[in-house]
Design a protein with these regions (language model features):
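Acidic, glycine-rich low-complexity segments
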Residues: 1-561
């Protein structure tokens, strides 16, 4: 036990070096010898190396440097520049209990089942082995080592901008409010001029089921391998469910991507209110967000940024085996969701949402959507997508999908397709992969909706409003948001569609197959088979059937108008 002051304590064997009375280095010696020490240091900037065994280390307020097991600390001009835990086998370590008081603490718990608790301050904690580097007292790097070693750590840090790399094992991490950076398994953090430059998980095949409870603030979480449980408080959080990498320039995010895409688990991620960014990664994940403008990738992918704003979101799995059946529940707000492959369920509350049911890409300029396009069009499965009130955009993708939208002017493509926007107005909507797709059920709410159902015997129902519907494949062109042309494409592909449009001035092209078309009151324009409509200043000027030899027996019932 030491009193008030800045004490240096080695619990077992060790060596401390000085030059001209200034400390230059400190290290454990005889690392396979020692005992279970109890070390208490009262207030001050203390340096403690527990050494061999399971030690109990307690400090009062101050900026403490603590190594739970064996290790070394190097100094320049009396300031620590490198702290490293260096046990290469669990036998020389122990289950340490570390309680650090308020302050900016540096803690390397080492191997075995450790418990680390800190009070308020900007703490840096490594749950297992690793290294911290500093320049002039400012953190430059934190990295895991001996990544295959480690065990079940419990880490709880107080309020502040904390940094935690939990390491190997099924760890539990809890942080108070603040802008925290947490890696659930092994990883590396690089800092330039005190700002985070790179965060990356390492050892993608290593790790376990972590429970990460991160408090209020703008947090960064890379959960790592395993079926992790991640919960974040209010704030704009960035979360990768499995392995990944995030890059920054001058503290501003530039790139976020999945790594080790064939490794991971079925994660459960909950982010409370804020503009959150979440990449679920490998497996069938459950992702839940509260109100805010969220960006969510259900599987593996990447997001690119310019000046801190997302300009490209892309899901990039090229095989179903690296994905899973995700369940995504997004709160009210203007959400961007790329569900990825497999049988996904997507539900959103009110807002102008953009949802891709399978793989694809979204592009933005100054925060405004410029394009949405499907990719890996032959892949995908049965998605269920339900979006709330608002002007929503949905490209459901491959498979027998069910799409339901609330009231608003929605744009829905039942299978694969591409949407292009100019000055925030729709310029072109086109289905793609005409021979691909399945029987979709599209229930579109009240509003002036645009629907291209795609391949298959689709069931389309639209609410009150002036809707534009193509039963099979097609393309619609606009100038400054005003329609100029509508035509069937892939005219030898499609199915026997059932299209019901409630009251309004609806435009419907049934396309290939034997279609059933029903409208309510309104001035409707209907082509039972393939065809083209041309417009001038938004007014229909010509209607022409095409590929008449490919038609079939349609049933058309129209209401008053």
């Amino acid at each position: 036990t030491t009193g008030l002051g800045s004490d240096t304590v080695i619990g077992d064997s060790g060596e401390i070096n000085y030059a001209a009375g200034v400390i230059t280095g400190l290290q454990s010696t005889a690392t396979d010898q020692g005992g279970d020490d109890s070390i208490t240091a009262l207030g001050g900037d203390n340096t403690i190396v527990g050494g061999f065994g399971g030690d109990a280390i307690t400090t009062g307020s101050g900026d403490d440097s603590i190594l739970g097991d064996n290790g070394l600390i190097e100094y320049v001009d009396g300031q620590a520049v490198r702290l490293s835990s260096n046990d290469d086998e669990v036998a020389t370590t122990g289950a340490d209990i570390i309680n650090a008081g308020a302050g900016d603490n540096r803690i390397l718990a080492g191997l075995s089942d450790d418990e680390v608790t800190t009070l308020d301050g900007d703490d840096v904690v490594l749950g297992d082995n690793g290294e911290l580097t500093y320049s002039d007292g400012v953190l430059t790097g934190a990295v895991s080592s001996e990544m295959a070693l480690g065990d079940v750590d419990t880490i709880a840090v107080g309020e502040g901008d904390n940094i935690v790399i939990a390491g190997q094992g099924a760890d539990t991490v809890t942080t108070g409010s603040g802008s925290d950076t947490v890696i659930g398994d092994s990883g590396e953090l690089t800092y330039v001029d005190s700002a985070l430059a790179n965060a990356v998980s390492s050892g993608a095949a290593l790790g376990d089921v972590d429970t990460l409870n991160v408090g209020e603030g703008d947090n960064i979480v890379i959960a790592g391998q395993g079926a992790d449980i991640v919960t974040t408080g209010l704030g704009s959080d960035t979360v990768i469910g499995d392995s990944g990498e995030i890059t920054y320039t001058a503290g501003v995010i530039t790139d976020l991507q999945s790594t080790g895409t064939d490794q991971g688990g079925d994660d459960n991620i909950t982010a409370l209110g804020g503009d959150n960014t979440i990449v679920g990664g490998f497996g069938g994940d459950i992702i839940t967000t509260d109100s805010g403008n969220d960006s969510i990738l259900g599987d593996n992918g990447l997001i690119e940024y310019v000046d801190g704003q997302a300009v490209r979101l892309s899901s990039n799995d090229d095989e179903v085996a690296t994905t899973g059946a995700d369940i995504i529940n997004a709160g009210a707000g203007d959400n961007r969701i790329l569900a990825g492959l497999s049988d996904d369920e997507v539900t959103t509350l009110d807002g102008d949402d953009v949802v891709l049911g399978d793989n694809g890409e979204l592009t933005y300029s100054d925060g405004v959507l410029t394009g949405a396009v499907s990719s890996e069009m032959a892949l995908g499965d049965v998605d269920t997508i339900a979006v709330g009130e608002g002007d929503n955009i949905v490209i459901a993708g491959q498979g027998a999908d069910t799409v339901t939208t609330g009231s608003g002017s929605d744009t829905v493509i039942g299978d694969s397709g591409e949407l292009t926007y100019v000055d925030s107005a729709l310029a072109n909507a086109v289905s793609s992969g005409a021979a691909l797709g399945d029987v979709d059920t599209l229930n579109v709410g009240e509003g002036d909706n645009i629907v291209i159902a795609g391949q298959g015997a689709d069931i389309v129902t639209t609410g009150l409003g002036s809707d534009t519907v193509i039963g099979d494949s097609g393309e619609i062109t606009y100038t400054a948001g005003v329609i100029t042309d509508l035509q069937s494409t892939g005219t030898d592909q499609g199915g026997d569609d059932s299209i019901t449009a409630l009251g309004g001035d609806n435009t419907i092209v049934g396309g290939f197959g034997s279609d059933t078309i029903t409208t309510s009151s309104g001035d409707d324009v209907i082509l039972g088979d393939n065809g083209e409509l041309t417009y001038f200043a938004g007014i229909l000027t010509a209607a022409m059937s095409s590929e008449t030899a490919l038609g079939d027996v349609d049933t058309i019932a129209v209401g008053e108008g």
